[in-house]
Design a protein with these regions (language model features):
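N-terminal glycine-rich anion-binding loops that anchor highly charged ligand groups
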Residues: 14-44
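Generic detector of leucine side chains in alpha-helical contexts
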Residues: 8, 16-19, 31-33, 81-84, ...
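Generic N-terminal amphipathic, Lys/Arg-enriched alpha-helix
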Residues: 1-10
Length: 96
């Protein structure tokens, strides 16, 4: 494979098996799985989680929350708020 730009290459069956294992561990421990959507940043992969019953996610920035906000209602931003981004955050909340 030759790629000229950064490209996400993923084995779907391995990823879905890993997701099933994470869900199983959470269920066995009476926990809610709230995965951190950091590396894949993909609506399609996010939908794999939804199809398995995941309803909440964590991201690392307001821009990532904005990216996923059209598909997800329960998003936690796992980093302190930068006060300079408050206008962006308020706009995102109003749009969704």
């Amino acid at each position: 494979m030759n790629f000229s730009t950064p490209t996400l290459v993923i084995n779907k069956s391995i990823s879905l098996n890993n997701l099933d294992r994470m869900i199983d561990v959470a269920n066995k421990n009476n926990l809610v799985l709230r995965p951190h959507f950091k590396t894949h940043q993909s609506i399609e992969i996010g939908n794999w989680f939804k199809e398995k019953g995941v309803t909440s996610i964590t991201v690392s920035s307001i821009s990532m929350a904005d990216f996923f906000s059209s598909e997800w209602d329960d998003i936690t931003i796992a980093f302190p708020l930068n006060i300079l981004e408050i206008v962006t955050l308020n706009l995102m909340i109003k749009q969704n």
